[in-house]
Amino acid sequence: MASGKMRIVVLFGGRSAEHDVSVLSATNVMNALDPAKYEAVPVFVTRAGQWLLSRFVNGALEKPSSGAELCLVPGGCGRAIVVPDAGAPYEADKIDIIFPVLHGLHGEDGAVQGLAQVARVPLAGCGIPGSANALDKDIAKRLVNEAGLSTAKSVTITREEVPAFSALEQALGLPIFIKPARQGSSVGVHKVVTEADYQAAMSDGFIYDDKLLAEEFIQAREVECGVLEDEGGALFVSRAGEIVPAESHCFYSYDAKYIDADGTEIKVPAELPEQVENEIRAIAAKAFRVLGCDSMARVDFFVTADRRIVLNEINTIPGFTDMSMYFKVMAVSGVSYPEIINRLVAHGLARGS
């Protein structure tokens, strides 16, 4: 921090199917970083996995196809080498902390978190165990079920073991939702009613992952809340918010989330009885701990008409876009976007010390 500012590398883009969502999220993070406090260094992770130095100009992040690459030094405690297109490599200014805004595989699954640990550089956000456990919906379900938390009934599907449609219908009823086990943002998710739907869902799902989940349909409201951990380990759980997909979308799909501006209605806070909301918040905190998460997560639920609370999933790098729920529920709970960033950085520095 020679300049007196904290040098924070913001990773965005990435190799996953959520690449474009990451760019939207990182743009908001860059806008929220206080320039008086932070020297933000955006680094674009290409779809091939290269780390290229980027720039934030006029409110937009550049996405270079080539240029200077940034390479962390193992055990370097923030040292990094820049490899330019031409000329000799040189040592970059010391990195104080990495802030990954990478959704899905290779960013939210413990991979980047492990790289930061090997390089001995602090990282904002969830660490290795929670990231790996939460991203894999199959593993996450097994862990939270073991802890006594309720989830939707499901069947795990691999390329080697694809059950017959009739068997799934008997086990789960109709409709069924097919989803990649290790993707977010509703990428590759399909609502299945017929054998033809099932075959199409299998073909598409296996593009994104080698493991899929078939889940029962639950007629319920979709409710989410945010969890934020301070550097001392105390958890703050936000008020709950509700997502109501438009009638033009049969579920909370990728298009409803990010493409169609009128794809969803977001109600913050959700209109829930106090007792139900308090139970949701308590389950969110428990699930966060059960999966070994730290720092932050968004926890998603179904709430049925008879007020049964069903845990859906946990996202350790929730969307940071204008339409994202995490920051809306935190704001209504009294925590602003810049304050969330500050707390994530403080937590990462404390964990890395």
From Swiss-Prot:
GO MF annotation: an example: D-alanine-D-alanine ligase activity
Keywords annotated in UniProt: ATP-binding, Cell shape, Cell wall biogenesis/degradation, Cytoplasm, Ligase, Magnesium, Manganese, Metal-binding, Nucleotide-binding, Peptidoglycan synthesis
Reaction(s) catalysed (UniProt annotation): 2 D-alanine + ATP = D-alanyl-D-alanine + ADP + phosphate + H(+)
Biological pathway: Cell wall biogenesis; peptidoglycan biosynthesis
SUPFAM superfamilies: Glutathione synthetase ATP-binding domain-like, PreATP-grasp domain
GO CC annotation terms, alphabetical: cytosol
Cofactor(s), names only, from the UniProt record: Mg(2+); Mn(2+)
Compartments in which it is found: Cytoplasm
UniProt remark on cofactor binding: Binds 2 magnesium or manganese ions per subunit.
PANTHER family in the cross-refs: D-ALANINE--D-ALANINE LIGASE (PTHR23132), D-ALANINE--D-ALANINE LIGASE A (PTHR23132:SF25)
Function: Cell wall formation.
Protein name per the record: D-alanine--D-alanine ligase A
Gene behind the chain: ddlA
